[in-house]
Amino acid sequence: MKKVILSLALGTFGLGMAEFGIMGVLTELAHNVGISIPAAGHMISYYALGVVVGAPIIALFSSRYSLKHILLFLVALCVIGNAMFTLSSSYLMLAIGRLVSGFPHGAFFGVGAIVLSKIIKPGKVTAAVAGMVSGMTVANLLGIPLGTYLSQEFSWRYTFLLIAVFNIAVMASVYFWVPDIRDEAKGNLREQFHFLRSPAPWLIFAATMFGNAGVFAWFSYVKPYMMFISGFSETAMTFIMMLVGLGMVLGNMLSGRISGRYSPLRIAAVTDFIIVLALLMLFFCGGMKTTSLIFAFICCAGLFALSAPLQILLLQNAKGGELLGAAGGQIAFNLGSAVGAYCGGMMLTLGLAYNYVALPAALLSFAAMSSLLLYGRYKRQQAADTPVLAKPLG
C-alpha cells in the first residue's frame, strides 16, 4: 500500500513542478524565446486551461480502461507536454506544450483518489489521499526552488527537461507498484452525470472554488504584501516562500493525521473558519512582521489541509461518476485561483493598500465555509427524510 501512495505522490510532485515551476522561470523564458514577460505569463493560464478542458474529457472517455492504464496514459501526457515545452521556440508551440501538460492534472488526482479508495480501509482513505497530495506540497517547498535555480544557473529548458525525465520515472513506479484494477462503479456516459442532479456535489464544488479563491486572493500578491505592508526586504522573500511552502506540507500532513478522528466535513469546515480568521488578522495586523509570517503560514497550511477531505467528500457524493466528480473538483480548484487573483486585484485597482486584498479573501473563504455548512444541513435533512420515505403507505 505504501508503494502505491508513494507512486501517486511522485505523480503529484511532477504535476506541482509543472504547474508552479513556470512562475520561477518567466524572465529567463521571455528573454530566451524573444517574447514579453506578460506573454510568458500566459503560459500559466494555458496550463490552467488544459486542466479545465482535459479533466472532464479524460474522465468521460476512459471508462473502458483499467485505472492503472489510465494513470499510465496520464503520466505519458505529462512527459509529452513537458518535452514539447522544453523543445519549443515559438509562442504557439510553447502554448500547446503547456496545454498538453495541463490535460492530465485533474484526472490524475481523480483516478489516484479512486485507486486509494479501493485498496485502503474506509477509515484510512483520507490519510492516504493526503499522502498522495503531499507530492504537490513538497513540490512547492523543494521542487520549485530547484527549478528556479536550474533556470538561473543554466537555462529554463533544464527545469522542464528535468520534469519530463522525472515523469518517466513516475511511469515506471505506476507500472510496477499500482495494482491493475478497474472502477466497476462506472456506468455509461449518461449515467456518469446522474450524481450532478443532487445539490451535494455542487456545494462541494462551491466550497472547493471559494476556498482556493480565498487564499489566492491574498497569496497572489504575497510578495508586495510582505514588502510594502510587513516591511520585509526582497531578499527575505526566498525564506518567506519556503516558510509558506512548509506550511503547505504540514497542513496536508495534519489533515491526514486527524482524519481518523474527525469527518472530512468537520475538518474542511473548521479549516475554512481558521483561514477566515487568519486572513482578517493579515488585514488588521500586517504591519507586524512576526504576526504576518504566522498567519501567512496558517493560510497556506489551511489551503492544503482542505485538499484531501474535499476530495473524499466529492467521491462520496459522485456515485457512478467518481472520476468525473474528482476531476470537477480540480476544475473548481483552478477556477478558484483565477477568481481569487481577480478579486484581490480589484482592491489594488481601486487604489487601496496591499493589505486590503485580505478582505475579499476572507469573504471568499467565508463563502467556502458556508457552502460546507449548507452541505452538512442538506445531508442531515436527507438522512432524516429517509426513514419517512421508507415507511409503507397507509
Swiss-Prot record:
Keyword line: Cell inner membrane, Cell membrane, Membrane, Transmembrane, Transmembrane helix, Transport
Periplasmic topological segments: 28-41, 90-93, 152-155, 222-235, 285-293, 343-351
Knockout consequences: No visible effect on arabinose uptake or growth on arabinose.
Topological domain ranges for the Cytoplasmic compartment: 1-4, 64-69, 117-128, 179-198, 256-261, 317-322, 375-394
Positions in coiled-coil regions: none
Membrane topology term: Multi-pass membrane protein
Biological process, per Gene Ontology: transmembrane transport
Transmembrane segments: 5-27, 42-63, 70-89, 94-116, 129-151, 156-178, 199-221, 236-255, 262-284, 294-316, 323-342, 352-374
Annotated GO CC locations: plasma membrane
Induction: Induced by arabinose. Transcription is dependent on the transcription factor AraC, the cAMP receptor protein (CRP) and cAMP.
Cysteine pairings via disulfide bonds: none
UniProt subcellular location: Cell inner membrane
Function comment: May be involved in either the transport or processing of arabinose polymers.
NCBIfam families membership: PRK10091.1 (NF007498)
Family, similarity comment: Belongs to the major facilitator superfamily.
Protein name, UniProt field: Putative transporter AraJ
